[in-house]
Amino acid sequence: RQMCIRDSLYIERKMTPLNLYLDRKDLTEEEMRQAIDDLGNCIKQIASANIFPGDMLHKNFGITRHHRVIFYDYDEICYMNERNFRKLPTSDDPYAMDTLSVAPDDVFPEQFEHFIVGKRHLKQMLKELHPEIMTCEYWQQVQRDTSKGDISVSYTHLTLPTRSSV
């Protein structure tokens, strides 16, 4: 007897949540840099597959034993065209209060540095390695590319893991 399973493939990987990995005391600066670089690459590859990850806190990413950063929080994902990437508005009036009119689908990439990674030196590392992900122009270009059908699918940064803190 033969059994054929079609159109279904499930991969399970044990990984360490990225925030716990980056908090390890035995981690070298180079290992941190490699993880932050792969985090930026992961975000960009997901976007180029026409997926906006939504909640990009580093606790929503894991790192495998082969030191690959993987995104695993799918509850806020959406298509790239479902978001409105905007620059933070500025005012010429020095007496104006900082106010912001925000629609439900507005995203301000300039704010990403405040929540993707928490520690100052890791934020700086991410900004040095992947400054484009903090710009509205980058995300709008990805939207234009994906709307034309220029979609790059890479499964190296998407999986259904089992969380662990190995």
What are the roles of these predicted feature ranges?
Residues L18-E30:
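Glycine- and acidic
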Residues K59-T99:
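Catalytic activation segment of kinase domains across protein kinase-like and atypical kinase folds
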Residues R1-I5, T156-T162:
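Conserved small/polar residues in nucleotide/adenosyl-binding loops
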Residues A96-L158:
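C-terminal region signature
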Residues D55, N60, T159-P161:
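Alpha-helical hinge/cap motifs
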Residues E29-G54:
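Conserved kinase catalytic-core helix
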Residues Q2, R6-L18:
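Conserved ATP-binding subdomain of kinase catalytic cores across diverse folds
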